[in-house]
Amino acid sequence: MGRKWANIVAKKTAKDGATSKVYAKFGVEIYVAAKQGEPDPELNTALKFVIDRAKQAQVPKHVIDKAIDKAKGNTDETFVEGRYEGFGPNGSMIIVDTLTSNVNRTAANVRTAYGKNGGNMGASGSVSYLFDKKGVIVFAGDDADSVFEQLLEADVDVDDVEAEEGTITVYTAPTDLHKGIQALRDNGVEEFQVTELEMIPQSEVVLEGDDLETFEKLIDALESDDDVQKVYHNVADL
């Protein structure tokens, strides 16, 4: 699973990097985190978390600094979080998380993306109850038992630790993600491939042929929207 999460980040960065969409999206996240607290990541855990994620996605330092500088200014631009749930072909389910300065625009864009690409937007809660919110931490290593013990000693609410192909994947309670990251740092982990809050499907579906092609186009349409921050789904191997 660790390889899966690392591959997701790599694919998204490669796909979005050409148009700098990933930079813009992280810029908004960094701005919001800095605006809501101190603009210093050493004094603002939420800001440090976003910056770490941005670095994992290869966001340049100047983009990060620009977003923080903007938050230090007198701008009063307000962003609102949103969630849109829906369905794709053949049992596929999707959760879209947004961060926007114009809710009406975003809602219309997401609904259009669903409708024009073989999907249907559902009501709030129609999909999310079939997903579990968890913290996901991925880093190089192979001793899952040792990592599990370290996290327990640090009183981290850890669900599971997996080792695969030289990669450790840790699943924590969402409230303990930051605590888990710090515990691992305290035990010598210096570099993380993934540190994310994820919505993980309780079961997955396999799509093939036209269904898979339709689903991929739907996901691309949703992720290409500037206001969409994260897209979660239950399709295996994607």
Curated annotation (Swiss-Prot):
Q: Listed GO cellular component terms? A: cytosol
Query: Does this UniProt record's set of keywords contain Heme?
Result: no
Please list every transmembrane segment annotated in the UniProt record, as residue ranges. Answer: none
Q: Which GO terms describe its biological process?
A: regulation of DNA-templated transcription
Q: Which InterPro entries match?
A: Integrase-like_N, TACO1_YebC-like_2nd/3rd_dom, TACO1_YebC_N, Transcrip_reg_TACO1-like, Transcrip_reg_TACO1-like_dom3, Transcrip_reg_TACO1_YeeN, YebC-like
Q: Which family does it belong to?
A: Belongs to the TACO1 family. YeeN subfamily.
Q: What is this protein called?
A: Probable transcriptional regulatory protein M6_Spy0297
